[in-house]
């Protein structure tokens, strides 16, 4: 019954916003249902003014299953550098789905094993993909696995079973650095940050394990000049520098925001601002970033999304003009225009989001 209601809502939305279909899409936004009965990608074309148009009524089936509940993760979906392929984790079936990105739709290429249990986060750089498996949540081990990505989107295993600092560490996100020669994984249960080095063949080694500046390192994003910015469940964010040899050193932090359950983090394209979602408080905080990577709190409540809104994933569009926010408690995706001073102005809201929905990526 719930799935029928969601399809009906998507149908109504598609009719309501059909007027924007006459204009060429400036980009797109993707999320996944994470439904245990069958995972689905929901896709939206983005117009020049930031509004979203639903594509594919009912979404695009991944050929895998989700868990039906939150994954406590960042990066459930990823787009390759050339905007050709969308990669999606299926945490319930231990698989990764590959979609070809078309102008107004998605086409499923294949479904592959994640070479581990409960995949929750995926990252891709050039022709190499890594997935983070939260096996510790299902009596297995936490690990990462790597794949080569062909020109047609086919995945070929490179390495698997590369363990984190322990068997069950509460991993949250895996991501490449901009050069593709490092991977970072956050471990919220051990308050640790793992750094893996990646050779020219895409093979990772490590990890080098470093203590987090505060409790519960969660989401993160790489900036410029070897800088990386991490959100922390304790209600704060910190900045680090990372070297090519895999060494991590704190620049500043933790910088408290006075909010609860600071989880997801995203940067502006010019690396002047960072935004974090405070899931427990129902709001978003903003930070400024200095040239040397030093973080300063800009606005503890840059957005008030509502006490029960449960804001989780957050993404910035490729043209750097818009932020999109997944609020599963409110059952919607919200879009905001980014001002030069880092403030955010509402431009769109899409309804019909399931509580289990996870991941948000924009182009």
Where are these regions (language model features)?
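Conserved beta-propeller blade signature
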Residues: 28-32, 85-87, 129-131, 183-185, ...
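Blade-level signature of beta-propeller repeat domains, shared across WD40, Kelch, NHL, RCC1
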Residues: 328-363
């Amino acid at each position: 019954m719930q799935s029928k209601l969601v399809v009906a809502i998507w149908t109504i939305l598609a009719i309501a916003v059909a007027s924007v279909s006459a204009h060429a899409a400036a980009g797109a936004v993707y999320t996944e249902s994470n439904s245990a009965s069958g995972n689905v990608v929901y896709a939206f074309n983005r117009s020049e003014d930031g509004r979203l148009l639903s594509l594919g009524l009912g979404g695009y089936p991944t050929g895998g299953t989700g868990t039906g509940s939150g994954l406590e993760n960042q990066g459930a979906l990823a787009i390759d550098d050339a905007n050709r392929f969308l990669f999606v984790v299926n945490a319930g079936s231990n698989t990764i789905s590959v979609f070809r990105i078309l102008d107004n739709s998605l086409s499923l290429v294949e479904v592959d094993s994640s070479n581990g249990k409960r995949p929750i986060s995926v990252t891709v750089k050039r022709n190499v993909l890594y997935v983070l498996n939260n096996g510790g949540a299902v009596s297995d081990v936490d690990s990462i696995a790597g794949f080569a990505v062909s020109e047609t989107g086919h995945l070929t295993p490179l390495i698997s079973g590369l363990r984190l600092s322990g068997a069950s560490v509460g991993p949250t996100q895996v991501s490449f650095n901009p050069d593709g020669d490092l991977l970072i994984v956050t471990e919220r249960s051990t308050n640790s940050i793992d750094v893996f080095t990646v050779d020219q063949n895409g093979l990772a080694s490590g990890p080098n394990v470093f203590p987090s500046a505060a409790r519960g390192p969660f989401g993160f994003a790489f900036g410029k000049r070897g800088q990386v910015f991490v959100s922390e469940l304790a209600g704060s964010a910190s900045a680090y520098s990372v070297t090519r040899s895999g060494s991590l050193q704190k620049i500043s932090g933790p910088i408290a925001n006075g909010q609860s359950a600071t989880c997801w983090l995203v940067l502006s394209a010019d690396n002047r601002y960072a935004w974090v979602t405070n899931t427990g408080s129902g709001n978003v905080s903003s930070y400024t970033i200095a040239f040397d990577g030093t973080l300063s709190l800009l606005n503890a409540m840059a957005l008030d999304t509502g006490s029960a809104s449960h804001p989780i994933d957050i993404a910035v569009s490729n043209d750097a003009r818009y932020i999109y926010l997944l609020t599963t408690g409110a059952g919607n995706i919200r879009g905001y225009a980014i001002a030069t001073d880092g403030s955010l102005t509402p431009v769109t809201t899409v309804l019909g989001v399931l509580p289990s929905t996870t991941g948000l990526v924009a182009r």
